[in-house]
């Protein structure tokens, strides 16, 4: 144990440059690293946890917290993780972690080979959990992806409704009965919105049996079964032409080695005047590798790509990238809402699962919020067409589409004014709140 202590002691002595980290080791000794504020405490209570923190901290910190062998002292897990991230960014990463990061980078393409059976197992790992769990921290529509906060003052329900309208505007749903394919349709919220509010005919495909059952029930209860259907299907099995394709929060599960096939599938599926919109988590600091704890416990086989990693596949497919938008802190705000709701319902969630599971989810939500605030992650939305002239030459039509749906929600036929006119937050909130309350 002495050698493990020495190695971790040396790594922390080098890393901590901002604030003070007080570490209590398994032998009862306490060492302080750095100086000044903030002052953060950490207890490592077992030799196993100490060994893990020495040789594989990217995995061991989360596992130790789940098992109660690593605990924040005098602070929250969020505060501890933020402290460590800030110091890793400025003081340098743990030397063993740098070596493991290189190894993860070297084998990342192998880790992301996701044939259909493996993709199904990966999805079941996270999405086929007790549906009541997600109802306790997501919005009423169960949108498990980045919301859209134009002012930052929106409620979670408002921001998720705005996200769906923002995406719908980019799909240019300019006539009724457009056939839409929703890849990774989740609990059905996007598909139901496109059918109800835009007159589309939507097919949602998912690999989650739990989500499929909920989505079908919601469509029936909403009286939309004639316009929306949901299927248990891998995207690679789809072979029918459609007018529009939307995919929100699914692309992270495709895998690097499958990007060419994914975008070729989009091109082959879209009709000549078709439009696709892909919304996914990405990284602003270039290609990387998935954290080992996230890969093991939360999203096996998943990866959040930089835009530079997807564009070669887009270009090879022959599709036009007609619009790319980077959403920076929107997901951090989304997850902050989820964390607060999870904390408020923690006892009820524990009754459905177990304490270790609750700790896992607490660690997950805290860590993921922080990578969007501190560690270069963001969301990107990319709009794609087959033809160069499918869409107008400027983005004004998107604003007009969002203005139109706000007008409908307020019971008006239109909102007066030309393209580019500012819609007051109060007016938008009235519309979105009314819409969100009806979901």
Model regions and ranges:
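Feature captures hydrophobic
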Residues: 1-160, 166, 173
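Conserved class I S-adenosyl-L-methionine
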Residues: 176-184
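Conserved SAM-binding loop of SAM-dependent methyltransferases across substrates and taxa
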Residues: 187-198
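Conserved SAM-binding loop
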Residues: 215-216
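A short acidic, Gly/Pro-enriched loop at the edge of an enzyme's catalytic core
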Residues: 236-245
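A short glycine-rich, Lys/Arg-flanked "PGG" loop and its adjoining helix->strand segment in the class I
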Residues: 260-272
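Conserved beta-strand signature within the Rossmann-like core of class I S-adenosyl-L-methionine
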Residues: 273-281
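Substrate-binding/catalytic lobe of Class I Rossmann-like enzymes that use SAM or dcSAM, i.e.
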Residues: 281-392
